[in-house]
Regions:
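Multi-pass membrane catalytic core of lipid/isoprenoid biosynthesis enzymes
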Residues: 75-101, 130
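N-terminal signal-anchor transmembrane alpha helix
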Residues: 30-56
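Helix-coil boundary and interhelical linker segments in multi-pass alpha-helical membrane proteins
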Residues: 27-36, 94-115, 146-152, 185-197
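Short, non-helical or kinked segments that cap or interrupt transmembrane helices
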Residues: 58-67, 129-142, 169-177
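Cytosolic, membrane-interface loops and tails of multi-pass inner-membrane proteins
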Residues: 50-82, 134, 214-229
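Single conserved hydrophobic/aromatic residue that forms the stacking wall/gate
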Residues: 1-15
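Interfacial segments of multi-pass membrane proteins
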Residues: 74-78, 100-104, 123, 137-167, ...
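Loop-to-transmembrane alpha-helix initiation sites
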Residues: 154, 170-178, 189-201
Length: 229
């Protein structure tokens, strides 16, 4: 009887532990999903559409390349408008993270920005309200890298900016930025969700700039900053 009681108690403890672990996993998935959705919703707020509409009365899709991003607005509307787009795209990533922290104050800023920022990239690139026709995600991705990985993210962005200044090719610098983060994130975090997110961000950047990369390969890409000698 004592042995049976001990076995029963052990099974009961195991069941309780299993239940606790499963509940924690479910809660973890829920909070991550909420942060991703929150980031996505803020990401869909394309600053360029509001700035261009206010400045010209036109839809951003009818301006230049039609891309709702800083480079297109700055080139075809003006520097002031381009800076406003830049500021707005940075701000929406920050605000999404702050709201995420208010919802989950027990989580670290790293975890909060990892998911809200990652969601913002998808929202910016593929907003449902524009049938998936969003921006190319350079500013949003840079902001996400800096807020999530700190100095590492900033260094990647600086090097990417230098690539643009030296070559004049914005698509090349854009792809270099997240690609540079891959080996360092792997070294620091190993095979982690951080590495998966950076890999996906790099693939997204390649997809969004594939036409520009193609033109670079075939010598057809114009010099965006005209600094190439």
């Amino acid at each position: 009887e004592i042995a049976s009681c001990l076995v029963g108690s052990e099974m009961c403890i195991r069941d309780r532990c299993y239940t606790v672990i499963e509940n924690k996993r479910k809660m973890c998935m829920i909070y991550k999903s909420i942060l991703l959705i929150l980031g996505y919703l803020y990401g869909t707020m394309l600053t360029a559409t509001f700035v261009v509409k206010h400045s010209t009365g036109n839809d951003v899709s009818k301006i230049g390349s039609g891309n709702p991003g800083m480079a297109n607005v700055m080139e075809h509307i003006g520097k002031k408008e381009g800076v406003l787009v830049l500021a707005g795209d940075i701000l929406k990533v920050i605000v999404a993270g702050i709201l995420g922290r208010l919802l989950f104050p027990d989580k670290t800023w790293h975890d909060i920005f990892l998911y809200t920022g990652f969601g913002a990239i998808f929202g910016h690139n593929y907003p449902l309200w524009r049938k998936g026709k969003g921006g190319k995600g350079v500013t949003v991705t840079c902001t996400w890298l800096i807020l999530t990985f700190g100095v590492l993210g900033a260094i990647c962005c600086i090097i990417g900016g230098m690539v643009v200044l030296l070559t004049g090719w914005l698509p090349l610098g854009a792809v270099v930025i997240p690609a540079l983060a891959i080996p360092t994130v792997y070294f620091i975090h190993g095979k982690s969700i951080e590495l998966v997110c950076v890999l996906i961000a790099t693939v997204l950047m390649l997809i969004r700039h594939r036409k520009g990369i193609y033109r670079i390969i075939h010598g057809e890409e114009p010099l965006h900053l005209k600094l190439k000698r």
